[in-house]
Amino acid sequence: MKKSFTYRDGSFYLNDKPYTVISGAIHYFRTLPECWEDRLTKLKACGFNTVETYTCWNLHERREGQFDFSGILDIERFIETAERLDLNVIIRPGPYICAEWDFGGLPSWLLKYPHMALRCDDPLYLEKVKPYYRELLSRLRPHLCTNGGGILMVQVENEYGSYGDDTAYLQKVVDIYRENGIDCTLFTSDGTARWMLSGGTLPDVLAVANFGSYVDQLLTLKEFQKDRPLMCGEFWCGWFDHWYEEGRGQRSPEDMAGELNRFFDLNASFNIYMFHGGTNFAFWNGANHTGEQYQPTVTSYDYAAFLTEAGDTTPLYETAKRVIEERTGVKAPDVAVKNSTKKAYGKVKLTESAPLFGNLASLSAPVRAAFPKTMEELDQDFGYVLYRTELKGPFEELELFCGDIHDRAIFYVNGKQVGIKERSRRNDPIRIGLGFGETAALDILVENMGRVNYGIKLMDRKGILGGVRLGQRFHYGWEMYPLTMDSLDGLTYGEASQSGTVPAFLRGTLTIEGTPCDTYMKLDGFTKGFVTVNGFNIGRYFNPAGPQKTLYVPAPLLREGENEIVVFESDGYEEAVVKLVDTAILHG
């Protein structure tokens, strides 16, 4: 049966009855599908009536023209789960989403088009948006409230007023929605500064505001839309972490109670960002670069949210449940809510090793060019690039320069590590000299640590930008190995040593008796890299940088019996052992 969701005289109406949107953010792409029902059930049990999620173009269309809506990307299954639990849905399809997500959810292949302007009324950009929207919106359309589904609202772009003022572009996004049958309520969301709202709103589209404190900021919306409902599109209950930072604090339940009560005082709707944060699996995290410092986001997206990264309830959850019951007069559904069992499986020895340099053929085919290419020129979105060349003498000791490294490079001469250079950080010089008749193999392993997801430095190409010089002389003649690390099945392993200084994959087996439980992985003897569990990339670790010291291993990734753990260590390790513990360490 079709539903009616409208607004008038400062209020929302669902089927002609006054309605307050009490929403929480849960991103389907940050939580395993096996966990969606648990997280959504807890949202319902807390008294919420709506779930909000972004959609991530860069995973749904990793390769131009090739679409994927399976597994963790099965947005229809996520929506259907919410509908079955009688939750309404808010969808924020971008195309740009920010979200502390690589490139703000835009696919990296857009950067192959040098003359394309992003996030504006650029014909080429919109030409690339339309096929994605056709695929995505065809899946959303049956779930619109106007077709009897749960989707009440769909967002136009995302915080656009913080970036630009091309309202013609915003209208084009609206037009694409309407052409694809999206006939439900549309909205924009922006910060509360007037310059943000003036750049990011449209006269005929509902505007909502995003912030993390002082609810009365919402009243600024009245200057732009006097008779429309007040709504906070993102109320930030916590925050995210960057590598090299100490990490954010926890919001007090008392403070949260006061803010929630003020929303109800103003008859305002709200969306808690995040209700459940989840995880930046694989290489999907984004980065900030608003000043001079490049700041990549960590793997955990716990966000100090109402539910932890593992989906456990927190004091903020209990506070929200109490306030919502008191202010709505509706008792939260009597639904059994249970936190997952955590288990400390102990130490796992990684007994096998596959050196990166000896396994390149199984991971990638080389691309040859005179000048170093960027990841995007190599048709690569995530992972690493190995740049390989031969140096020939004679030349006196010269400093090795790279134009720009995005984002972290490890240098090897004849297989021996000679230095590391990292974007926006103070780096020691690397010097090389060769005599008559001497040659040297130079390898540069560059990691993409996450594309910028917010602000004016969004055009964040990866790899070596601007070439490599010895002193003042450019060096030409390169082999490049794009290393997406999508599949590690072809690696050839030998016996692992107890320590190592070259990049390598280390493999071991975790044996589980009985039903698997959630656990957390500590990698105390390791420096930097990523981990796969039974072939699934659970994300990056970076021990010297912190603050995150454990990686979340969700129970659905594990099985009774033998489980394969593969650690890729880029810098070098001191002990080939990982430890599975029962407590997360996010600020170690």
List each model region and its residues.
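Carbohydrate-binding surfaces of carbohydrate-active enzymes
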Residues: 125-155, 166-170, 174, 183, ...
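Short hydrophobic beta-strand segments in globular cytosolic domains
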Residues: 19, 418-419, 538-539
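N-terminal carbohydrate-binding accessory modules
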Residues: 1-50, 80, 526
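Aromatic- and glycine-enriched glycan-recognition loops and surfaces
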Residues: 28-45, 64-81, 398-400, 404, ...
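Aromatic-lined ligand-binding clefts that engage carbohydrates, nucleic acids, or primary amines
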Residues: 396-412, 442, 510-534, 541, ...
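Aromatic- and acidic-residue-enriched carbohydrate-binding clefts of CAZyme catalytic domains
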Residues: 17, 54-59, 63-66, 71, ...
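Aromatic-lined substrate-binding rim segments of carbohydrate-active enzymes
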Residues: 36-102, 174-179
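Substrate-binding/catalytic cleft of secreted carbohydrate-active enzymes
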Residues: 2, 91, 95-128, 134-272
